């Protein structure tokens, strides 16, 4: 009987070791999908920035049947003529002026995900306003499907 308990204890220890190893690897693989940025980063060599990012998002969203979340109708051109008159009396040397500036954190933004890092197609699609049925749990083929898999199906 004690031999059986010893084997059972050994098997449980091996199983626990295996589960802990798998759990630690899962944590590492999930962390690869999280992007973080700071103000000192340079754009990724294969990142999408500026006008290129805008064009890709526009084309992707329209091909998926959705709209961009950041709509141009909410953008307003600012009137800067009167600003110059108010600031005319304030003069700073370059060093003093730059001392008031700090680098912006771009964490969690489309710029962080796609310009400073290399983003994937499903990360780009998160910035589209997609139809409700797009991320349904059951696809047209009847199999269980996540939004990522359905997105890949749409481009296949």
Swiss-Prot record:
Residue numbers covered by the propeptide annotation in the UniProt entry: 79-93, 96-102, 141-156, 144-156
GO annotation, cellular component aspect: extracellular region
Location in or out of the cell: Secreted
Q: Name one GO biological process term.
A: neuropeptide signaling pathway
Which tissues carry this protein? Answer: Expressed in the central region of the cerebral ganglia mostly within the F and C clusters.
- For this chain, the annotated S-S bridges are 37-114, 49-119, 61-128, 112-115
Modification 4-carboxyglutamate, positions: 152
- Any one GO MF annotation of this record: hormone activity
Tell me which UniProt keywords the record has, alphabetically: Cleavage on pair of basic residues, Disulfide bond, Gamma-carboxyglutamic acid, Neuropeptide, Secreted, Signal
Top-rank taxon: Eukaryota
Q: Which InterPro entries match?
A: Insulin-like (IPR016179), Insulin-like_sf (IPR036438)
Q: Where is the signal peptide?
A: 1-31
The UniProt function text for this chain reads: Involved in glucose metabolism.
Assembly information from the UniProt record: Heterodimer of a B chain or a B chain' and an A chain probably linked by three disulfide bonds.
User: Into which family does the record put it?
Assistant: Belongs to the insulin family.
What this protein is called in its record is Insulin
């Amino acid at each position: 009987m004690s031999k059986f308990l010893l084997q059972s204890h050994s098997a449980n220890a091996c199983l626990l070791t295996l589960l802990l190893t798998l759990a630690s690897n899962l944590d590492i693989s999930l962390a690869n999908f999280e992007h973080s940025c700071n103000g000192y980063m340079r754009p990724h060599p294969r990142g999408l920035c500026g006008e290129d990012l805008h064009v890709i998002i526009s084309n992707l969203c329209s091909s998926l049947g959705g709209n961009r979340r950041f709509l141009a109708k909410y953008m307003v051109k600012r009137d800067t003529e009167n600003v110059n008159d108010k600031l005319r009396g304030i003069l700073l040397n370059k060093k003093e002026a730059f001392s008031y500036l700090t680098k912006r954190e771009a964490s969690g933004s489309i710029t962080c995900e796609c310009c400073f890092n290399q983003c994937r197609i499903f990360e780009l699609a998160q910035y589209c306003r997609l139809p409700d049925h797009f991320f349904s749990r059951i696809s047209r083929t009847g199999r269980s499907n996540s939004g990522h898999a359905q997105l890949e199906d749409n481009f296949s």
